[in-house]
């Protein structure tokens, strides 16, 4: 059974984090989870040197700053998480590294965070902290790009779930197992989605184009074989286009509550986060769980 006895909710006290809090509260209530509410006092990289944080501490009263943030964190908790079991935690240093470390130390089952807050990276489509956490985290990571615009399902009931696959057995079979088990336990409808790479949406102008038929048939055959190996028999949507766009449009049409994607081990600079995952996380109209 998939469960999340411990959830890590890193917050920078921004409006994005405040908008994500109802999802954390609903999911923690559903799974009876303990929530670690983590705030990292970020030490500017320019102050790191031979003396570490000492240089920064010489200019900033660190205990006073931490105490001020502790009060802000307590107010954030009271305003957003209600009766959920919460353990506040304040640390200083590099946010992404600390989030990954705390997740390992506390053996959390899920990290929940918006894709960016109000920081120096607010102009980017995805904040650097979220990108690093997606890259390094060993547990599933829940993200939402615009949580304020999303509807929290009542009692966190998932009705429609999409699972984006690439039809690569080594990476997708574990992903299929996780998504199928989660959907079954939550009594949700699960649909697979696969984007045909290398083609734009307008490239197939004729529905009977032989190239279109060939490419789509190959994709469907690979997915059928994948499902046979995984022991699943799920409905599949195969469409041409950019992966992020295909997943987004289908999620809108299906009124999806959740998108599940994988972060398979690949020999590329992206490490655990496979290609196209950034686009899905960035563009999805609903929360995304990266496993």
Protein language model features and the residues they cover:
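Intrinsically disordered or low-complexity boundary/linker segments at protein termini
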Residues: 1-19, 47, 110-115, 132-177, ...
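Structural beta-alpha unit
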Residues: 1-2, 42, 71, 75-111, ...
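Residues at the starts of beta-strands that form the adenosine-phosphate
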Residues: 6, 32-36, 85, 159-160, ...
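Histidine-anchored nucleotide/phosphate-binding helix
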Residues: 21-28, 175-183
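General small-molecule cofactor/ligand-binding pocket signal
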Residues: 36-38, 87-91, 142, 191-193, ...
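Acidic, proline/glycine-rich short linear motifs
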Residues: 39-71, 193-221
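Short, well-ordered secondary-structure micro-motifs
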Residues: 48-49, 124, 153-154, 173-174, ...
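Glycine-rich, Arg-bearing micro-motifs that act as flexible, cationic patches
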Residues: 110-135, 258-283
């Amino acid at each position: 059974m998939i469960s999340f006895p411990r959830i890590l909710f890193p917050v920078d006290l921004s409006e994005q984090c405040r908008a994500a809090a109802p999802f954390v509260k609903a999911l923690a209530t559903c799974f009876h989870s303990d929530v670690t509410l983590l705030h990292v006092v970020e030490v500017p990289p320019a102050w790191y040197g031979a003396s570490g944080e000492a240089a920064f501490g010489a200019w900033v009263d660190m205990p006073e700053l931490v105490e001020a943030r502790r009060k802000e964190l307590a107010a954030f908790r009271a305003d957003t998480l209600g009766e959920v079991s919460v353990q506040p935690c304040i640390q200083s240093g590099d946010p992404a590294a600390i989030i990954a470390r705390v997740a390992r130390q506390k053996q959390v089952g899920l990290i929940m965070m918006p894709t960016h807050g109000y920081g120096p990276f607010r102009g980017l489509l995805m904040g650097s902290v979220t990108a690093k956490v997606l890259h390094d985290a060993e547990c599933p990571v829940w993200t939402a790009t615009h949580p304020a615009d999303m509807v929290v399902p009542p009692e966190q009931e998932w009705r429609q779930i999409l699972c984006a696959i690439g039809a690569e057995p080594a990476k997708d079979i574990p992903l299929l197992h996780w998504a199928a088990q989660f959907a079954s336990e939550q009594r949700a409808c699960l649909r697979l989605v696969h984007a045909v790479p290398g083609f734009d949406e307008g490239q197939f102008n004729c529905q009977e184009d032989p190239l279109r038929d060939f490419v789509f048939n190959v994709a469907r055959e690979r997915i059928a074989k994948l499902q046979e190996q995984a022991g699943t028999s799920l409905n599949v949507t195969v469409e041409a286009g950019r992966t992020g766009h295909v997943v987004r449009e289908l999620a809108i049409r299906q009124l999806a509550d959740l998108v599940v994607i994988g972060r398979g081990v690949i020999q590329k600079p992206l490490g655990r986060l496979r290609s196209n995952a950034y686009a899905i996380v960035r563009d999805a109209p609903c929360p995304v769980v990266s496993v």
